[in-house]
Amino acid sequence: MFTGDIMDIVIRKMSNEDKKEVIDMMEVFYSSEAVYTNGSLEIFENDFYACISDNPYIEGYVFVSEDEILGYAMLAKSYSTEFGKQCIWIEDLYIKEEYRGNHIGTMFFDFLDKIYKNVLLRLEVEDENIPAISLYKKSGFEVLPYKEMMKNKRL
């Protein structure tokens, strides 16, 4: 748990009690232009349960003030052979619209810097998401010259 002095915000790991609110936020996030796919309730539930289980590859956090969840984040763990160290992918970072601009994102990146020392942090952002890009650059992220590609195999 991490406590900030801005709005008395606490960053804590997700718990089962957070399910409805986190999934509601995921539905908003995944229906926005910030992501490539719209997801589905099945995917959102799988992601949520992976975050609250002992799955070593994913962690989920919520940002809370006075018992209200203001946003959430999901992190995926991997290893970067290019940089020779652990890599944390910030898969989801969502803050409810009415709480944006309150430095919650900055507080979350400070939190990550404290718990993940000497770890590569990566994320994806749409070119049009200027406020997010500004936050990420202020937090020390750099634009990479790569194109992101994927192959989505369904069994």
Regions found by a protein language model. Give the residues of each.
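A short helix-loop-beta-strand connector motif used in the catalytic cores of GNAT acetyltransferases and
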Residues: A50-V62
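Conserved beta-strand in the GNAT
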Residues: G60-V62, E68-K77
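Conserved acetyl-CoA pyrophosphate-binding loop and the N-cap/start of the following alpha-helix
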Residues: Y99-F111
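Conserved active-site alpha-helix within GNAT-family acetyltransferase domains
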Residues: T106, D127-P145
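Conserved GNAT acetyl-CoA-binding A-motif
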Residues: F109, Y116-E126
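Conserved beta-strand-loop-alpha-helix junction that forms the acyl-donor binding cleft
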Residues: R122-I133, M149-R154
